[in-house]
């Protein structure tokens, strides 16, 4: 399959200038090093992802080739991981092959592709692109008054590596239909979905309402529920499977306000094809992003309220309040209050301050404080310097009461548009992180992660990045998708190109 796909696209190259357009991009990542306390410490591995596309009028063909090589036996692979043929004409779009599609707000099924992200599971030690697609077909029609989408495909279990058989990574067969009408900026829609795997077959429906009052407010609401003979279609008891999501947003010039609500119960479908909105703020700061609340789809409800205001002198204020409730054998409450303020003292300074307070009963962290500052200073010409400081204080009550301190310091210099260099230092006295598994003793005190990061854009199509040192892992969230990043000690080189 790989050879046939590459031969097909190579055959199109001579015709591309006359009959169409050929484009692509490539990501190459080399690592020399390993996880902490893991042998060998000088492990050598590399990962490569090549994406090629050909477009002629309404026809588009794409493929993705991935390979990974490591000294660890059994983790290497070389695969044609994606291919797609897409046809688009007027308001009709058809796809065959691998595709990323979402029905509604993702309460029932969501596909995604986190561009530039490389995923690795500790159990397999194999790196590959982080995406969840389907293999099958999709048809979509988007009219002025009516829209329609139908899909059928096998969903990818992206926690399993490409070194396994394809059948083992695509267990769920998803069949879905979404349709709706739009009148006077208001949309009413319906979703029907069936998910089948060797263990079960589930049926769901979903009602959609969305729209806006132009220039004033916009809203989005979805209610999803399973279809079963012994369960009423609107039941919300312990035996039911349902999800509810709603959002309101208001924007008026320099002021904006948004509100989100969620209520998910027994909404883990199949191997995890559903991925509803998290309704928690996705932080850009390291200590907060690692502490982000990850929704538990077996039972979770909550709200998020966020507002912003931009002053006449371009100062910017952001406020966010989040609350989530998990009802298991007892209630677990998550609360978070976040404030961020950006201002410009003088022509060359840009300063951002933030403060955060949270309680997380599921993690037994109460309270949890964080604060920090980012200072950008324009030196001369296109040169600037950056100082980034974060601090987090946590009280944790498990067997014993303990206090943790997490810190981040980043000192960097950059030249616009393509050069940046930074010294990164992180520290923590969290006992979950500091104990060395290769010794009989229980280590305490502080653990440190020093590192160097650099990036250079050689030209508009080629970028080279470098990391050397120790990198702290942990939870990370991007575009509403949360995953685990592994620790790393060594050297990492990335080269990205597009053509």
Task: Tell me the role of every PLM-derived stretch.
Residues 32-42, 51, 67-74, 84:
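Asp/Glu-centered strand-loop micro-motifs enriched in Gly/Pro and often flanked by an aromatic residue
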Residues 49-55, 62, 84-86, 177-178:
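Predominantly transmembrane beta-strands of Gram-negative outer membrane beta-barrel pores used
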Residues 131-135, 147-200:
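Hydrophobic, small-residue-rich alpha-helical packing segments that form membrane-like cores
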Residues 19-37, 46, 54-63, 94, ...:
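Transmembrane beta-strand segments of Gram-negative outer membrane beta-barrel proteins
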Residues 111-119, 124, 169-173, 204, ...:
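A subset of solvent-exposed loop/turn segments in beta-rich extracellular surface proteins, enriched
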Residues 29-31, 38-47, 64, 78, ...:
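Exposed, low-structure sequence patches enriched in small/polar residues
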Residues 4-14:
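Sec-dependent N-terminal signal peptides
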Residues 59-152, 247-271:
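Outer membrane beta-barrel
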């Amino acid at each position: 399959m790989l050879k046939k796909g590459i031969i097909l696209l190579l055959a199109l190259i001579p015709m591309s200038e006359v009959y169409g357009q050929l484009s692509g991009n490539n990501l190459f990542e080399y690592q020399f090093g390993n996880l902490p306390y893991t042998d060998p410490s000088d492990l050598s591995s590399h990962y490569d992802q090549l994406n090629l596309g050909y477009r002629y009028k309404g026809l588009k063909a794409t493929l993705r080739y991935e390979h990974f090589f490591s000294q660890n036996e059994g983790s290497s692979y070389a695969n044609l991981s994606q291919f797609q043929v897409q046809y688009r004409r007027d308001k009709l779009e058809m796809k065959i092959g691998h595709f990323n599609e979402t029905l509604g707000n993702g309460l029932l099924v969501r596909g995604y592709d986190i561009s530039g992200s490389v995923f690795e599971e500790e159990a397999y030690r194999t790196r590959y692109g982080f995406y969840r697609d389907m293999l099958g077909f999709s048809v979509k029609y988007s009219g002025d008054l009516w829209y329609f989408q139908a899909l059928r495909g096998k969903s990818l279990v992206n926690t399993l590596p490409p070194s396994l058989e394809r059948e083992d990574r695509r267990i769920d067969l998803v069949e879905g239909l979404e349709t709706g009408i739009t009148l006077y900026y208001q949309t009413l829609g319906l979703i029907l979905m069936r998910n089948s795997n060797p263990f079960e077959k589930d049926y769901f429906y979903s009602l959609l309402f969305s729209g806006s009052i132009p220039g004033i407010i916009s809203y989005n609401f979805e209610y999803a529920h399973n279809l079963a003979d012994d369960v009423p279609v609107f039941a919300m008891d312990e035996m039911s499977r349902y999800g509810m999501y709603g959002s309101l947003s208001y924007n008026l010039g320099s002021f904006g306000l948004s509100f989100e609500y969620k209520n998910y119960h027994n909404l883990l479908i199949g191997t995890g094809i559903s991925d509803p909105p998290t309704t928690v703020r996705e932080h850009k700061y390291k200590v907060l992003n690692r502490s982000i609340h990850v929704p538990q789809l077996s039972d979770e409800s909550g709200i998020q309220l966020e507002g912003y205001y931009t002053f006449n002198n371009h100062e910017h204020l952001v406020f966010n309040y989040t609350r989530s409730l998990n009802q298991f054998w007892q209630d677990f409450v998550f609360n978070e209050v976040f404030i961020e303020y950006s201002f410009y003292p003088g022509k060359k300074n840009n300063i951002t301050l933030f403060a955060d307070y949270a309680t997380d009963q599921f993690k037994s962290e109460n309270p949890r404080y964080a604060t920090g500052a980012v200072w950008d200073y324009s030196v001369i010409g296109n040169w600037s310097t950056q100082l980034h400081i974060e601090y987090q204080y946590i009280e944790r009550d498990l067997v014993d009461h303990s206090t943790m301190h997490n810190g981040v310091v980043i000192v960097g210099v950059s030249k616009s548009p393509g050069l940046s260099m930074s010294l990164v230092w992180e520290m923590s006295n969290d006992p979950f992180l500091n104990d060395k598994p290769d010794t009989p003793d229980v280590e305490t005190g502080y653990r440190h992660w020093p590192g160097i990061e650099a990036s250079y854009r050689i030209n508009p199509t080629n970028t080279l990045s470098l990391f050397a040192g120790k990198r702290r892992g942990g939870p990370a969230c991007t575009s509403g998708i949360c995953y685990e990043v592994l620790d790393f000690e060594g050297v990492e080189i990335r080269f990205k190109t597009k053509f």
